[in-house]
UniProtKB/Swiss-Prot annotation:
Pfam families: AA_kinase. Catalyzes the ATP-dependent phosphorylation of N-acetyl-L-glutamate. Gene3D superfamilies: Acetylglutamate kinase-like. It is found in: Cytoplasm. Keywords: Amino-acid biosynthesis, Arginine biosynthesis, ATP-binding, Cytoplasm, Kinase, Nucleotide-binding, Transferase. Pathway: Amino-acid biosynthesis; L-arginine biosynthesis; N(2)-acetyl-L-ornithine from L-glutamate: step 2/4. Belongs to the acetylglutamate kinase family. ArgB subfamily. CDD domains: AAK_NAGK-C. It catalyses: N-acetyl-L-glutamate + ATP = N-acetyl-L-glutamyl 5-phosphate + ADP. Substrate binds at residues 64-65, 86, 185. InterPro entries: AceGlu_kinase-like_sf, AcgluKinase_fam, ArgB, Asp/Glu/Uridylate_kinase, Glu/AcGlu_kinase, NAGK-C. This is Acetylglutamate kinase.
Length: 287
């Protein structure tokens, strides 16, 4: 009986959050180990289904860097990263398109639809479809890194129509310049940020392989305000790959996204814990 009561109390704790977030838009960037391990993949799909069943509108943007690297290695194509961004020649772009749009996007859609069988399910898109992600060429610190795109505009009309019809858009980050018809590989974090900003999302959630932003003792910093992050970078608390994520988070907050969350996708149900409990499990960034 005590265990049953405990479960009831957990549901009761979630009620204020469910009420507050009903009908709101969450943009989730899906990547890392959560995309690679079977148990984590299925756990993630169930979590997204639960968000949908309690009335939250979810837009999913996925990465796939490890799968792209594995395919490039199989094809004996060398790959190089410049400050976390893949240098993308024509061959690498073709592989990225094949892996992101042809394989991963459809795998994710089918996995989500299995868990949302009695409602409008997931629908797979890329940034090419209906000019969803219109891009210009991206330069990394002034360096030409090939066919890498920076999102210029988002077709929010299409996304809004889909979520109003209760579909869950699943977006592969391949964008296009419609004037030149040139396709571009887009960093998934950057794509998710632009989509969240242009939708005015309630939340932007990054799934990573770490427990959010850590202090120098290795403990998770549960919340960061926009006026704190520069100091955390300057004193070496935030380093390496977390710097572009925190920069994206601050950009999103300043452009109208209410809160950004950086959580560990290797922990089962981390999204539910972060969204529906007072304590959370990762780092929350806000004004």
């Amino acid at each position: 009986m005590e265990q049953l009561l405990e479960k009831a109390l957990i549901l009761q704790e979630a009620l204020p959050f469910i009420r507050d977030f009903y009908g709101k838009v969450f943009v989730v960037k899906y990547g890392g180990a959560a995309m690679e391990e079977e148990e984590l993949k299925h756990s993630f799909a169930k979590d997204i289904a639960l968000l949908r069943y309690v009335g939250i509108k979810v837009v999913l943007v996925h990465g796939g860097g490890k799968d792209i690297t594995n395919m490039l290695n199989k094809l004996n194509i060398q790959t190089e990263f410049i400050n976390g961004i893949r240098k993308t020649d024509k061959e690498s772009l073709d592989v990225a398109r094949m892996v992101l749009i042809g394989k991963l996007n459809k795998d994710i859609v089918s996995m989500l639809n299995k868990e949302m069988s009695n409602m409008h399910g997931a629908i797979g898109l890329s940034g090419i479809d209906a000019n969803l992600l219109i891009c210009t060429k991206y330069y990394q610190d002034g360096e030409d890194i090939g066919y890498v795109g920076k999102v210029k505009t988002v077709n929010t009309k299409l996304i809004r129509e889909l979520i109003q019809m209760d579909y869950t858009p699943v977006i592969a980050p391949i964008g296009i310049d419609p004037e030149s018809n040139q396709m571009y590989n887009v960093n998934a974090d950057m794509a998710a940020t632009e989509i969240a900003c242009e939708l005015g999302a309630e939340k932007l959630i990054f799934l990573t392989d770490t427990d959010g932003i850590l202090d120098k003792s290795g403990k998770t910093i549960s919340s960061i305000h926009k006026n704190q992050y520069k100091e955390l970078i300057e004193d070496g608390t935030i380093t390496k790959g977390m710097i572009p994520k925190i920069n994206s988070a601050i950009d999103a907050i300043l452009r109208g996204v209410r809160k950004v969350h950086i959580i560990n996708g290797k922990i089962k149900h981390s999204i539910l814990i972060e969204v529906f409990t007072k304590e959370g499990i990762g780092t929350e960034i806000s004004l």
